[in-house]
Amino acid sequence: MSTIEERVKKIVAEQLGVKEDEVTNEKSFVDDLGADSLDTVELVMALEEEFETEIPDEEAEKITTVQAAIDYVNSHQG
């Protein structure tokens, strides 16, 4: 099974239409990977589905980088 980091990066690449090797931990979804507000909503929804969790809106607003997404999932698993 893939690590959480690998799974998050795969989802980000698929949702934003970028290559997986462009998705590094420090990248901002908006500033570096070209996401708009709709992309970020869809990204959060994809993360919720993949990791079978619910991300409240106030938390979703804080998930602006690849690392923030990884950290959120890590802290809300199991």
From Swiss-Prot:
What is the recorded function of this protein according to its Swiss-Prot or TrEMBL entry?
Carrier of the growing fatty acid chain in fatty acid biosynthesis.
- Full protein name: Acyl carrier protein
**Which branch of life, at top level?**
Bacteria
Q: What Gene Ontology molecular function terms does this protein carry?
A: acyl binding; acyl carrier activity
Please provide, in alphabetical order, the Gene Ontology terms of the cellular component aspect for this entry. Answer: cytosol; membrane
Show the SUPFAM superfamilies listed in the entry: ACP-like
Task: List localization entries.
Answer: Cytoplasm
Residue ranges that the Swiss-Prot or TrEMBL entry lists as coiled coil? none
Please tell me whether the keyword Lipid metabolism is annotated for this protein: yes
Q: What is its main location?
A: cytoplasm
PTM description: 4'-phosphopantetheine is transferred from CoA to a specific serine of apo-ACP by AcpS. This modification is essential for activity because fatty acids are bound in thioester linkage to the sulfhydryl of the prosthetic group.
Give one Pfam family, short name only.
Answer: PP-binding
Q: In which pathway does it act?
A: Lipid metabolism; fatty acid biosynthesis
- Is the Lipid metabolism keyword given for this protein? yes
> Gene3D superfamilies this protein is in?
ACP-like
Q: Keywords, A to Z?
A: Cytoplasm, Fatty acid biosynthesis, Fatty acid metabolism, Lipid biosynthesis, Lipid metabolism, Phosphopantetheine, Phosphoprotein
Q: Which residues carry this modification: O-(pantetheine 4'-phosphoryl)serine?
A: 37
Q: Which protein family is it in? A: Belongs to the acyl carrier protein (ACP) family.
Any one biological process term the GO annotation gives? lipid A biosynthetic process
| Every Carrier domain range | 2-77
Lineage runs: Bacteria, Pseudomonadati, Pseudomonadota, Gammaproteobacteria, Pseudomonadales
Q: Which InterPro entries match?
A: ACP, ACP-like_sf, PP-bd_ACP, Ppantetheine_attach_site
PROSITE patterns associated with the record: CARRIER, PHOSPHOPANTETHEINE
Instruction: Name the source organism.
Output: Pseudomonas putida (strain W619)
